[in-house]
Structure formats: structure tokens, C-alpha cells
């Protein structure tokens, strides 16, 4: 095995461990919250894309994290955080981290972003988008590399936290093709592969 291969394998193991740890932290927080706050389908989100996401997140999820800081709209209060995250397949294609997004800076340096998503009904959504940035402000800050997308559905009490796309509802071939075409949709493939960055992982 060549030295670059050894280095690459070591980096992938580090990435795998960081993602698995962050996912476990998030999943455990949600499970504890369901024990204390009841059925997740009864949780009430704030209005779609409105202020109050940090207060909501603190009540239902954030208080179970070990954090350095947390903030909502003015992210510079708690970190020199990113305003946007770009795609691995096209670094010029970026997504803004919008207003009304709760940001948690965990004590291991990882970041968790929480914001409403899906199709709102009567001004409210039952879906949250969650981004995990496994190494915070450190580079590369690219989807598929160190930033991964998850969905929290308040309509599904059995499997509320889902990778995107879902690892349990798609074949590996579909997950791989999806990840190859859009680096913001790679968490499903990684969860399917037990959070390992396998040889055919595109990013």
C-alpha cells in the first residue's frame, strides 16, 4: 500500500469516527427528549422560517448536548461560523445558512444546525433539516466531505431521525448514485455503510 493510500485511509477513518459520534449525539438527544417530552408527533414547531428556532431547539434537543455555545440569527455571537456551505462536486454551488437557524457549537468542535423545512401546512412545518459539520469552522466545509444532511420528521415516531436520502428506504445503488450527483445527499449512503467511507464513496 502506498503512502498516499495509507494517509487517505487514516483520514477516512477519522471522518467516519467524527460523523458516527455526531450522529449518535444527535440521536441520543432526540431519544432522551421523547422520554421527557412525549410522542414526537405531538411536538409543536414554531412557524415556518420564523424566529424562535433556538428556543424550540433548546427545549426539545439542545439541552441534551454538551455545548460551548448556541445562537440563532447572529451567529458571530458564538462562533465565526460560515454563512454558507458549498457542494463537493461543484464548490461554486453553495447554500446559505439562512435566518432562523439554530446553531450549536459542541464541545468537540462539531457544529449542528437546525432549521425548519419540508412543505408547511397552515404556516407550520412538521419537518426539520439538520446539518452536521463534523469539524466546525475547519476546512473543507463541503457537503459530502465534512457536512452532512439529516431530516427530523415529527410525523414519524418510529424513525424520526433519518439520513438524507433514507438509508432504510433505498438500495445502496440508489444511495450511491444520489450521492454522486449531489454531495448534499450522502448521509444515506454513509449510514447504509455503517458510517464508513468506502472505496467507491465519491467524495
Regions found by a protein language model. Name each.
Residues 1-30:
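Amphipathic alpha-helical segments typified by the pilin-like N-terminal helix
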Residues 27-46:
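Alpha-helix exit/C-cap motif
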Residues 49-203:
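Intrinsically disordered, low-complexity regions enriched in Pro/Ser/Thr/Gly and acidic residues
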Amino acid at each position: 500500500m502506498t503512502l498516499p493510500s495509507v494517509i487517505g485511509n487514516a483520514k477516512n477513518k477519522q471522518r467516519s469516527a467524527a460523523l458516527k459520534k455526531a450522529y449518535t449525539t444527535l440521536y441520543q438527544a432526540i431519544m432522551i427528549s421523547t422520554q421527557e417530552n412525549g410522542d414526537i408527533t405531538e411536538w409543536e414547531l414554531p412557524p415556518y422560517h420564523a424566529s424562535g428556532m433556538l428556543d424550540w431547539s433548546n427545549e426539545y434537543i439542545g439541552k441534551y448536548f454538551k455545548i460551548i455555545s448556541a445562537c440563532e440569527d447572529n451567529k458571530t455571537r458564538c462562533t465565526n461560523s460560515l454563512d454558507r456551505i458549498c457542494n463537493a462536486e461543484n464548490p461554486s454551488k453553495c447554500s446559505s445558512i439562512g435566518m432562523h437557524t439554530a446553531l450549536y457549537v459542541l464541545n468537540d468542535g462539531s457544529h449542528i444546525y437546525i432549521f425548519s423545512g419540508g412543505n408547511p401546512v397552515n404556516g407550520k412545518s412538521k419537518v426539520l433539516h439538520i446539518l452536521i459539520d463534523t469539524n466546525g469552522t475547519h476546512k473543507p466545509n463541503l457537503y459530502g466531505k465534512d457536512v452532512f444532511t439529516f431530516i427530523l420528521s415529527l410525523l414519524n415516531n418510529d424513525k424520526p431521525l433519518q439520513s438524507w436520502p433514507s438509508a432504510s428506504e433505498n438500495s445502496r445503488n440508489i444511495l450511491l448514485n444520489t450521492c454522486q450527483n449531489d454531495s448534499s445527499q450522502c448521509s444515506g449512503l454513509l449510514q447504509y455503510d455503517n458510517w464508513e467511507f468506502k472505496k467507491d464513496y465519491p467524495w
